[in-house]
Amino acid sequence: MIDKNQTCGVGQDSVPYMICLIHILEEWFGVEQLEDYLNFANYLLWVFTPLILLILPYFTIFLLYLTIIFLHIYKRKNVLKEAYSHNLWDGARKTVATLWDGHAAVWHGYEVHGMEKIPEDGPALIIFYHGAIPIDFYYFMAKIFIHKGRTCRVVADHFVFKIPGFSLLLDVFCALHGPREKCVEILRSGHLLAISPGGVREALISDETYNIVWGHRRGFAQVAIDAKVPIIPMFTQNIREGFRSLGGTRLFRWLYEKFRYPFAPMYGGFPVKLRTYLGDPIPYDPQITAEELAEKTKNAVQALIDKHQRIPGNIMSALLERFH
């Protein structure tokens, strides 16, 4: 530490530059011992960083509840129109899609590559890799609604329907939990439907190596065969760097298998670059079996991962991609 009376002028090589800068700032702002304040601020940052990383993922839940509040307000304001209109929720969907699309652009510089592979009309089954938090799919649904004017139905886990307050959100955005016959009916009606075969298990267990956790699930393939629709593979680059899960530990895996509820804590919320890639559609083939189609689809999703994702994923690299 140098004396404040010591000159910080030109030629004083013995005086460290940063110390001189601190003393100048102390004089400008009239604050004594600025260096101590800065050291204390640095200490607070070190202490609270882990807490911030654990809290940030729940900001997404906060945004979902804001969306739900908006939908309730919208419903009350349009209660009389409901009896006369079959498109009561179109205005709400457009508003919510615009807000989520804006969040995607600002926080993640979100992009979709291969949007032309989504049909303008007619059915298709979208199969996607499930991140720790599927925020990429929320963004993707917003893009589909804005650019295609279509609502993409999605199969959600049973526990999602038990979350307090979520029923209206799930209803407005056409989420369902099955069964297989319902999925086939939706596709035969000409709608888009999305399924993540890995589901919550993949969200919890997969990690920065982006291993696909589908087990022996092939029900989605049977749905595509029964409905005679193409399958479109989908993967979002850096989704595991945006949010990370501790669900791969033995305790949290046991808890999930026992109670079928994701108890594992998450951390992240980093503003990494997110790019969703849509692969070439896998056309309907009446000669293929569900097992063969499931394996073919898994290979297609894996090909997207191999082509577009750095393995293992790196949070800092994903952040720097925002500037590329």
Swiss-Prot record:
Q: What is the first-listed, main subcellular location in coarse terms?
A: endoplasmic reticulum
One GO BP: triglyceride biosynthetic process
Q: Does the keyword Transmembrane helix apply?
A: yes
Documented EC number(s): 2.3.1.-, 2.3.1.20, 2.3.1.22
Query: What subcellular locations does the record give?
Result: Endoplasmic reticulum membrane
Give an example GO molecular function: phospholipid:diacylglycerol acyltransferase activity
- For side Cytoplasmic, which residue ranges? 72-125
Q: What class of enzyme is it?
A: transferase
Q: In the UniProt record, which residues carry a glycan?
A: N5
Question: What's known about how it's activated or inhibited?
Answer: Acyltransferase activity is specifically inhibited by TMX1 at the endoplasmic reticulum, restricting accumulation of triacylglycerol.
Q: How does it sit in the membrane?
A: Multi-pass membrane protein
User: Could you tell me what this protein is called?
Assistant: DGAT1/2-independent enzyme synthesizing storage lipids
Q: Which organism is it from?
A: Homo sapiens
Q: Which gene encodes it?
A: TMEM68
